[in-house]
Every structure is written in C-alpha cells, then in structure tokens.
Amino acid sequence: MNIDLSNFDTKNVTDMYGMFCGCKSLTNLNLSNFATKNVTNMRKIFYGCTSFTKIDLSNFDTKNVTDMSWMFSNCKALKGIDLSKFNTQYVNNMSGMFSGRESITNIDLSNFDTKNVTDMSWMFNRCKSLANLNLSKFDTKNVKDMSYMFVRC
C-alpha cells in the first residue's frame, strides 16, 4: 500500500501520536511536504509499520518534539533510516524508540542531543541485527529509566 500525503496541510498540527500506528501493509509513504515544526508528540507515529523498507524523513522538523517514544518500534523491515537532521534538543522520552527493529544493522545517532532525556527504557530492545551503535556522545546525566534498554540485542 502506498499513501501520498504530499498535499496534507499539517502546519498547525501539534500531536501526531500513533498517526500511522499498525499500518502493516504500508510500504511507501510520501511525507515530503509534511510540516512538523509545531509537533511536540511523535509517540508511536510509525509503530508497527512492519512492511516499511525505507522512509524519507529529511524534511521533518523535530525541534519542538518532546516525545519520540516507540516512534519506529516494530518497523521490522526498515533496514536503514537517516536521522541526521533530527533535532532532539527538547526530547525527554525516547523509550522504545527503535525497539523491535530486527533488520537494522546500523543506527547513526551521533547528532542526537540527549541532555533532556529522562527515559531511555526499551530503546534498542530486540535490535537483533545491530552490528554498530556508537552512543559515545549520548548525555545521560538526566536519564532516570534505562530498564531493558538493550535487552535481546
């Protein structure tokens, strides 16, 4: 299934919680014109999109997002994703963000600003194919919950 949302006007949207959650047959999604600068909640936005193999989020403006929990969880076929333009300066919840990404081998989070994150629980749970994960720049001084962060990796 393909969905073209290139004409959606999302400039006033603040909450995208679960927007595509459980879209198991969704393979292609055109989000090229999605305006996300006012969004604060992206929790579970792509949760369970098991047929995704790639998704272009290069136009996503995440500077105001505070919740990215379970964002890509159970996107089992998604092998790679470019998050280099993600601004995570205000994010406080990254719980389960990549949980269940069984096909992914590498995640580059070198640009992630984690100084305000308090919850990283389940973040990389079941990332079974992950061969490289550099978290050397992660600032974890405010994190309160790291339970099950790397379980079944």
What are these regions (language model features)?
Residues 1-153:
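Negatively charged
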